[in-house]
């Protein structure tokens, strides 16, 4: 499975990438620190899954979901993650495949990956 990560916290994004590659044998195609750079990665790679942080410096991740279909043609599943549980319902309403709360629990991530 091919993955792109968009998270403005460089260390969190790198830790997630390492976990996805080592524990789940996923191919992380890139990690962007903002939505604009993330769009470039999505256009270039057409991943199967996007791990998207809600709080980004240039746009709210929840608003970013609305723009994704033009870039992924509906083929990319979005897994959002956030430290704020009040965003969970909105993320699902915006068609997120799943939502994880930070810090990401590996048991919860196991469940998401298996789906």
Regions found by a protein language model. Give the residues of each.
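Non-catalytic signal-transmission and effector/linker regions of two-component phosphorelay proteins
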Residues: 1-2
